[in-house]
């Protein structure tokens, strides 16, 4: 338990000093981590853990929606909003149906988003 508290404090401290670009990357990584745990819960028929990790993943997508800047992002922001909303729907279905395939769909989309985000962020860093 003590290690968990120390890790959480460290993570919160890291989040406090990271750039907005790094924070988005961390959110995508969190989605992947929680989805993996939700899949384990589905396999183990652990309803409580499945619900917990689906809720955590959903909360991250909601946070991503809330951080979208529609003025600067234009069409991309609207596209991402729709995509994030669809991922939330898939998570809800995964939870209702106890369906690992729905979680896999979310994982595949999130991996693509993370890869694209890293590429864009790396290109911005090189350009500076």
From Swiss-Prot:
Query: What job does the chain carry out?
Result: Required for flagellar assembly and thus bacterial motility.
Q: Upon deletion of the gene, what happens?
A: Cells are non-motile, flagellar filaments are severely truncated. Strongly reduced levels of secreted flagellins FlaA, FlaB and FlaC.
Assembly with partners or alone: Interacts with flagellins FlaA, FlaB and FlaC; preferentially binds glycosylated FlaA over non-glycosylated protein. Requires the 10 last residues of FlaA for binding. May form a 3-way complex of flagellin, FliS and FliW simultaneously in which FliS and FliW do not directly interact.
**TM ranges:** none
The record, for Pfam families, names:
FliS
What's the protein name? Flagellar secretion chaperone FliS
Q: What is its main location?
A: cytoplasm
Q: Which residues form a coiled coil?
A: none
What gene makes this protein? fliS
Concerning its family, UniProt says: Belongs to the FliS family.
Recorded GO cellular component terms are: cytosol
